[in-house]
Amino acid sequence: MSALGYRTFKDRLFFWSVCFFASLTAIPLFLIIWEVVKKGYKQINLRFFVETAPSTLDAMLARNSGELIPGGIANGITGTLMMVAMASVIAIPVGILGGVYLAEKPKAVFTSVIRFLTDLVQGSPSIVIGIIAYSWVVKPLGSYSAIAGSTALAIMMLPLIIRSTEETLKMLPGSLKEAGLALGCSYTSVVIKVLIPSAFGGLFTGILLAISRVMGETAPLMLTALGSSAINWDVLQPTSAVPLLIWEFYNDPNLIDMIWSSSLFLLLLILVLNIIAKQVAKKWKTA
């Protein structure tokens, strides 16, 4: 074999080795998605989205008669959306302001403290965040509530938003800020009216990724929101969520089919959010 042929052989061997090991990581993911879709699509209908979780008796009677389990996860969907919305109201402004500070004051002593705390929170198990929210909100209020659940989710969203904001602002050319200051604008005006709008695509992507990250959390909500069998709009009362319903269905053999349909809904919701985030990031980079 000539030297050129040997190098070509090595290149092809390396290429196909990379493809093989990449497929090893992708195959389990596709198998999981296929399993969830195959077992979950049967329960997906209009009632699944507008009715609350079924009782054990109704599920048992339906299974014995060979019918679809009645009811749905409307209480979980409304609870998830409500708590994520409240968590976003808390985490988005705080996270953006924190990211702006880290990007604009990289050498400040307080910046190192914020970075350390951000990394610490991001690496903490979700159950620990739930315990913190329990001691901060549940115990003082005397009951589990949607506010407590949203507090736990907001804490988990903060590191992602702070980091994405910081990295996005660092990618902006320094001439933007210099031009604004040269025109006589105050530093605050430059940040609010120039830097943040210019970084909107990156900020929006980070926010969507943070939301998709917390939508599937169960452990912190078990210690804060607890769950509810009905649709509850009172933020001071226990509230359900889709991950909590999946856990409840798991503990009832008669509701096993609802696990797959609920998982499919949650999987598709998070997948859509991630696709939107990727598209926004792609358009922002090419703009």
Model-assigned labels for residue ranges:
Residues 2-12, 16, 35-87, 107, ...:
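Periplasmic/extracellular loop-to-transmembrane helix junction in inner-membrane transport proteins
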Residues 1-24, 277-287:
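Transmembrane alpha-helical segments of polytopic membrane transport and secretion proteins
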Residues 125, 183-184, 197:
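Glycine/proline-centered hinge or cleavage motifs at structural transition points of membrane proteins
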Residues 86-118, 278-286:
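Transmembrane-helix boundary motif in ABC transporter permease subunits
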Residues 166-170, 208, 248-287:
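C-terminal transmembrane helix and the adjacent membrane-cytosol boundary/short C-terminal tail
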Residues 187-223:
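Transmembrane alpha-helices
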Residues 60, 221-267:
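Interhelical loop and adjacent transmembrane-helix boundary motif
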Residues 119-155:
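Generic hydrophobic transmembrane alpha-helix motif, especially the helices
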